[in-house]
């Protein structure tokens, strides 16, 4: 088997020199704590994940393969840095257990010959064999290599012959399976004649991903799936560099920019994403972006947030691969250069902050293509964070939430757009063929502004444009309030609904126009206004067994043109929201905040913010 896939023995041994310098000393401490915790838990076995599957846990084998991969990598790296027989022996045991599984296909994908679990296990096996080569008996090593051939290469080729769907899609399944299998096949090239064909097919399948990956490096499946996708892509890129001196993946479109995408949607280290995997992708392999492209912002982000979690025994390698891949000659600033308004045109997402690196006030908005993978009826949706706490939230809507839904809740969410911070009309969901876009963006001394066009998502003849304006103190650059102004134009008399979702406790005032949202640490004051009569109610719903949401549900009737203003502020808003529209434009007043818009041919344009 080819050696030195991600690093050779000399490189692993040289990592010991890093442990006395910052930040590697902290990374190594986290790695040792994780490895010590792994020793206190039982090894991962097929019996375990099958029992979990029988209790109804989805992806039990895939998660077990992922955890095994992380354990093998971290234990092996820690052993190479500071030789420890217990770490070495446990890594070998985890590897032996993995290779003894009867299948590397998750039971939830039992109609496939190969799946994500196959790739996770195959990569874990070949890297583990490589890094533990001298610690495994030759006969056992041969058995492990045979397991990769029988449980990964052969099933993968069978899946391609069966024209499996993931080979031709563009999203994370494509990259995880094809990149993981390309890496494993490349390592197995001297062991099995099928490896060359498997690698060729895997790389051919990845062309669909590269064709869809935009120059701005954004990913329409959100931060969690971005991490899953880019992690496997980078591991393959590093293997190509080490085994073939091939840098073609690193030179592909968008990869030099993609490291910035998750930073803008994880303010203060908390995900503000728009998908059903809203996680912070703080994976050790992501340091390869900082290493290859000298992205100081990526190194800062990972240094700042990846060590802030308690050690666990599950998941991928974080600290181990951070020790291996973090550049040691990159001067990382305490205040990275990040834009206070950032748009990603390829997917129609945008983010704004009063200041970086630790925003006091932050908002994110999402438009884009409603036909993408994991799309939701959340065109023009918004999220809001105040002092690190998410106050207006996009909740993940997965299988678990449906299981816990009451009948009344199910009826309410039959219009799934109601589950998001957006607007729907006539009880219609957002149209699957809609393509929205960010049409305006601006950062000024005392404001931030983006405007989003829903692209017909609310139905034929309905135009929905959402403005998100942040009022910022010109001297301190501290955010004061976020004003959301919705332009809704409809050629027919129809009911509209606007929803704002939160984890906090909502208290609606008697006038029905002002409210407070009390979070764990912060309270947000809300004021609502419209150019037509509206009704505002507070609803609550159960997301799953341990999480509930509250929402402000605004309803009204519209024919022609309607403006709705929603103001979110850290301080109480002294007066109700006033909206005045004229031939010249529109003015929104909330307390001492005054926002002026000028009229253009297609939509309003921000002209001034005063407070």
Model-assigned labels for residue ranges:
Residues 1-56:
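Low-complexity, Ser/Thr/Pro/Gly-enriched N-terminal "stalk/linker" regions
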Residues 4, 20, 24-28, 59-268:
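Aromatic-lined, polymer-binding surfaces characteristic
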Residues 183, 354-356, 369, 423, ...:
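Short, flexible loop/turn elements at secondary-structure junctions
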Residues 273-278, 391-416:
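Aromatic/acidic polysaccharide-binding cleft in carbohydrate-active enzymes
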């Amino acid at each position: 088997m080819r050696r030195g896939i991600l690093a050779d023995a000399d490189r692993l041994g040289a990592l010991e020199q890093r442990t006395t310098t910052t930040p590697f000393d902290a990374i190594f401490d986290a790695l040792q704590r994780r490895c010590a915790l792994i020793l206190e838990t039982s090894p991962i076995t097929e019996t375990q994940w099958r029992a979990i599957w029988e209790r109804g846990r989805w992806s039990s084998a895939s998660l077990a393969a992922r955890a095994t991969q992380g354990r093998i990598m971290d234990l092996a790296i820690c052993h190479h840095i500071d030789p420890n027989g217990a770490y070495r022996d446990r890594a070998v045991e985890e590897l032996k257990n993995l290779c003894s599984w009867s299948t590397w296909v998750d039971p939830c994908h039992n109609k496939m010959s190969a799946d994500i679990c196959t790739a996770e296990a195959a990569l874990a096996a070949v890297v583990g064999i490589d890094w533990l080569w001298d610690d495994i008996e030759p006969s056992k090593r041969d058995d492990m290599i045979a397991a990769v051939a029988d449980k990964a290469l052969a099933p993968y080729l069978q899946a391609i012959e069966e024209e499996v769907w993931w080979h031709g899609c563009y999203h994370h399944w494509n990259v995880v399976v094809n990149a993981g299998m390309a890496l494993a096949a490349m390592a197995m090239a001297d062991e099995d004649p099928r490896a060359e064909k498997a690698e060729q097919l895997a790389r051919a399948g990845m062309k669909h991903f590269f064709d869809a990956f935009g120059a701005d490096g954004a990913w329409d499946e959100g931060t969690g799936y971005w991490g899953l996708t880019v992690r496997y892509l980078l591991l393959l890129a590093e293997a190509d560099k080490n085994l073939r001196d091939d840098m073609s993946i690193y030179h592909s479109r968008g990869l030099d920019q993609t490291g910035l995408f998750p930073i803008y949607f994880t303010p203060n280290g908390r995900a503000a994403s728009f998908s059903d995997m809203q996680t912070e992708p703080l994976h050790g392999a992501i340091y390869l972006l900082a290493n290859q492209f000298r992205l100081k912002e990526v190194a800062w982000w990972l240094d700042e947030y990846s060590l802030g979690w308690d050690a666990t025994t599950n998941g991928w390698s974080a600290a181990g691969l951070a020790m291996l891949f973090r550049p040691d000659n990159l001067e990382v600033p305490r205040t990275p250069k990040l834009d206070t308004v950032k748009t990603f045109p390829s997917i129609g997402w945008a983010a704004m902050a009063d200041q970086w690196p630790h925003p006091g006030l932050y908002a994110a908005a999402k438009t884009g293509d409603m036909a993408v993978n994991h799309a939701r009826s959340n065109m023009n949706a918004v999220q809001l964070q105040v002092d690190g706490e998410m106050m207006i939230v996009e909740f993940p809507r997965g299988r678990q939430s449906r299981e816990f839904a009451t009948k009344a809740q199910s009826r309410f969410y039959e219009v799934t757009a109601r589950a998001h911070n957006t607007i729907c009309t006539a009880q219609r969901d957002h149209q699957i063929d809609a393509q929205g876009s960010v049409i305006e963006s601006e950062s000024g001394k005392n404001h931030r502004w983006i405007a989003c066009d829903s692209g017909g998502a609310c139905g034929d003849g309905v135009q929905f444009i959402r403005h998100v304006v942040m009022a910022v103190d010109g001297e301190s650059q501290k955010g004061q309030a976020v004003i959301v102004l919705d332009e809704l134009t409809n050629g027919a008399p129809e009911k509209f609904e606007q929803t704002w979702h939160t984890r906090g406790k909502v208290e609606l005032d008697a006038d029905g126009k002002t409210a407070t949202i009390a979070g764990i640490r912060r309270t947000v004051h809300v004021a609502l206004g419209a150019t037509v009569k509206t009704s505002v109610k507070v609803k609550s719903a159960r997301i799953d067994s341990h999480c509930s949401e509250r929402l402000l549900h605004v309803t009204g009737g519209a024919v022609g043109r309607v403006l709705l203003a929603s103001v979110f502020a850290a301080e109480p808003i002294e007066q109700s929201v006033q909206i005045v529209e004229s031939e010249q434009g529109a003015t929104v007043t909330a307390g001492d905040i005054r926002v002026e818009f000028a009229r253009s041919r297609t939509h309003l344009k921000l002209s001034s913010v005063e407070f």
